[in-house]
Amino acid sequence: MVRIIVKNVSKVFKKGKVVALDNVNINIENGERFGILGPSGAGKTTFMRIIAGLDVPSTGELYFDDRLVASNGKLIVPPEDRKIGMVFQTWALYPNLTAFENIAFPLTNMKMSKEEIRKRVEEVAKILDIHHVLNHFPRELSGGQQQRVALARALVKDPSLLLLDEPFSNLDARMRDSARALVKEVQSRLGVTLLVVSHDPADIFAIADRVGVLVKGKLVQVGKPEDLYDNPVSIQVASLIGEINELEGKVTNEGVVIGSLRFPVSVSSDRAIIGIRPEDVKLSKDVIKDDSWILVGKGKVKVIGYQGGLFRITITPLDSEEEIFTYSDHPIHSGEEVLVYVRKDKIKVFEKN
């Protein structure tokens, strides 16, 4: 285990014209599972490379526990001395080596006997349930088995920190849940500090105890997954984390008005953006007698589609072209007027810049 301290780290390229990281500060605790979430170009890979020692911060400092490992453009502790294991997006297995040889590769430059190497490889392979494929080449393995070999190779030197870079993007959807569960189980068993980087919130939320959101090189929010989902600092963060309706409205004494809809919230600016997740919207032809739901007005069904056992229904408020979508277990015909309800404690309000 190791504690990672990132202090005022910035990274610029092309003589300062491209800012990849902008004054990032993070503390990752011993044994913590920490996730970095962000869109393409947010600086996630640059952040990972600085942690790994493959790049250095232009300004700022990086500590492993109390040890300064990089500072202001200088590499103080090289990658091989940081006790890091990495799993890349492509897994990067050597096609001409068996699974055993791939896993053992990081040990070849260490002063270990063949018996010690064999014992360590088999120990890690057993944890990951791949001991029966150690003599197979990567081309003979399934995608899930290849990923386990890559994970075993990262763990074979008993690292203090495990870095995962978009680790599940090459797996098909049906295998991802089990792969995420495996990573979490192995981390808990070994107690290694874990940093996972991904653009997919499902990857991050399934593994991480805390999450940092990177947008255009800035760390804009850090918190538990459920806190980020329910209380995002911006509509951009909200949309990164999950599906959300984004509605721009006018602020009045009655709240935020969007056509025929009125959201009873307080905002200091003249215009505001309402964010409401599809599961927090309910459409009905009848009055709903449930205090957790509030009526915000009427809308007209514009589009209805069927996906995954549910109907995806898109409506427009009367007198507005804004669109709101939600999911329902029963269809509502296009063109019908409906009452629009929302969960009153789930309305998200963002000031319009």
Curated annotation (Swiss-Prot):
Pfam families: ABC_tran, GlcV_C_terminal. It comes from the Archaea. Its EC number is 7.5.2.-. Optimum pH is 6.5 for ATPase activity. Its main location: membrane. It catalyses: D-glucose(out) + ATP + H2O = D-glucose(in) + ADP + phosphate + H(+). InterPro entries: AAA+_ATPase, ABC-Glucose_import_ATPase, ABC_transporter-like_ATP-bd, ABC_transporter-like_CS, ABC_transpr_FbpC, ABC_transpr_MalK/UgpC-like, GlcV_C, Mo/tungstate-bd_C_term_dom. ATP binds at residues 40-46, 89, 166. PROSITE patterns: ABC_TRANSPORTER_1, ABC_TRANSPORTER_2. Changing residue 166 to Q: Strong decrease in ATPase activity. Can form dimers in the presence of ATP alone, without Mg(2+). Disulfide bonds: none annotated. Changing residue 144 to A: Loss of ATPase activity. Cannot form dimers. Forms an active heterodimer. Residues 4-241 form the ABC transporter domain. It is found in: Cell membrane. One of its GO terms (molecular function) is ABC-type ferric iron transporter activity. The keyword Transferase does not apply. GO terms for cellular component: ATP-binding cassette (ABC) transporter complex, substrate-binding subunit-containing. Changing residue 166 to A: Loss of ATPase activity. Can form dimers in the presence of ATP-Mg(2+). Forms an active heterodimer. SUPFAM superfamilies: MOP-like, P-loop containing nucleoside triphosphate hydrolases. The keyword Transport applies. It is a peripheral membrane protein. Part of the ABC transporter complex GlcSTUV involved in glucose uptake. Responsible for energy coupling to the transport system. In vitro, as a free subunit, exhibits a constitutive ATPase activity. The complex is composed of two ATP-binding proteins (GlcV), two transmembrane proteins (GlcT and GlcU) and a solute-binding protein (GlcS). Forms transient head-to-tail homodimers in the presence of ATP-Mg(2+). Belongs to the ABC transporter superfamily. This is Glucose import ATP-binding protein GlcV. The lineage of its organism: Archaea, Thermoproteota, Thermoprotei, Sulfolobales, Sulfolobaceae.
